[in-house]
Curated annotation (Swiss-Prot):
Topology feature Extracellular, residues: 79-99, 160-193
Phylogenetic classification of the source organism: Eukaryota, Viridiplantae, Streptophyta, Embryophyta, Bryophyta
Membrane topology term: Multi-pass membrane protein
GO CC terms: plasma membrane
Protein name per its UniProtKB record: CASP-like protein UU5
Amino acid sequence: MSTVAQDSAPGGGKIQDAMEQGAPGASSAAVVPEGGHYTQTPSPAFQAVKKNINHMSAFSLGLRVAEFVLSVIAFSLMASADQNGAVYSTFTSYSFVLAVNVLVVFYTIGQIIMSVLLLVSGSTPKKIYLFITFGCDQLSAFLLMAAGAAGASVALIINRGGVTDAYGNGCIDGKITSFCSHAQASVAFTFLSFFCMVISSLLGVYSLAPYLIL
C-alpha cells in the first residue's frame, strides 16, 4: 500500500526515480535507509580534512615527544640548580617554572600514549577528544609562557646584581654562577616547549575545522 500511495502522490514517483537514477537536481548527500528517514553523508571537503588529520598524526606525535623531552630537561635543570645555598625554591618564579614543566611532562605522556594508540588502530579521533585536547593545549601553552616570562625576569634581576645581600653580586662574582646557568637554561627550554605547544594548539584548530565550518 505504501508503494501505491507514493506513486499516486503528485510527483512522488518522479522524485524517487530521479534520486535512484542520479538525475540532475537530485541530492547526492541524502541517503534513505530502510526506516524511511533521511541522513546526511559527510561532504567531500569534510572527508578530505579528516583524511589529512589522520596523515598528521605522526607529526603530532613528534611534537608531543619534543614537548616531553624539552620539559623534562627544563625541570631537571631547575631541580639540580643548587650552589652556595641558592636553590630554585628560594625564588618563587623558579618554583613556578619547575611546577609547570612537571605538569606538562605528565600531560604529554598521556598525549603520546593516545597518539600511539590512534596511529596503531588507524582510527580518527573523536570530536570530544579533539575539543578536550585543544583546551588542554591552550592551557599548557599559557602556563609555559607565563612560567618562562617569570623565570626570565628573575634571571635578569640576578644577572644585574639584584640579590646582592644573600649572594654577593648574583651571577657576576661567581658565587652562584652554576646556579644561574642551570636556571637560565631551564627557562630557555621552557620557552622551547612553549613554542612546540603552540604548534600543537594550531594543529588542534585544524583538526576541529571539520566540526566547526564544514
